[in-house]
């Protein structure tokens, strides 16, 4: 039986759109997807879907918290019902804040744009079908989770971000990086917008391209999203760093 999932789109950016790419990254043969604006009344849809993915955003969970108060309430309601929910980048931070964690500026106080090497924690690699303990993942953020929700489990970290992936409860996962984005989208769209917005300077572009050399979206992280949505992993069964 096919399952229904919703991508909660948290962006109002008009210079590019990667909704279709994001859905395709996480879609399986037995799933149907719809894209829903995170700025609508989300409480009306909570029982219409089997799980949810929260997208990235140009907004801040701290500076724009009033704008997303409805999203935070929705996250708590979904979590209480133990429905699967995955947050990507801004979505990861929203998940953390809504469930009692804290988000702050990157430790470096600089915008992080490039790829980082993530190290899996608490045996996550075994649950996503890989023997590799490290993967490269695209990062594009000025803020990050600095305190996980109480009772959560750390699933991955990197040198730049202590909390790259975490889980709380049985089926809620936050991923700070962007497993959905292709190298092409990053180079053609994200790079252009970050240069226009001043998040990246021209003299940093060479470093960015060097980091991106040979990059492929990590299938292990995409599999983590799919397994979470389809309840193939119960994170409460993981024993580790809480």
Swiss-Prot record:
The active site is at 89 (nucleophile), 178, 180. Keywords: Glutamine amidotransferase, Hydrolase, Plasmid. Its EC number is 3.5.1.123. One of its GO terms (cellular component) is cytosol. It is an enzyme of class 3 (hydrolase). InterPro entries: ChyE-like, Class_I_gatase-like, GATASE. GO terms for molecular function: hydrolase activity. Hydrolase that catalyzes the hydrolysis of gamma-glutamylanilide (gamma-GA) into aniline. May prevent the accumulation of gamma-GA, which is harmful to cells, during oxidation of aniline to catechol. This is Gamma-glutamylanilide hydrolase.
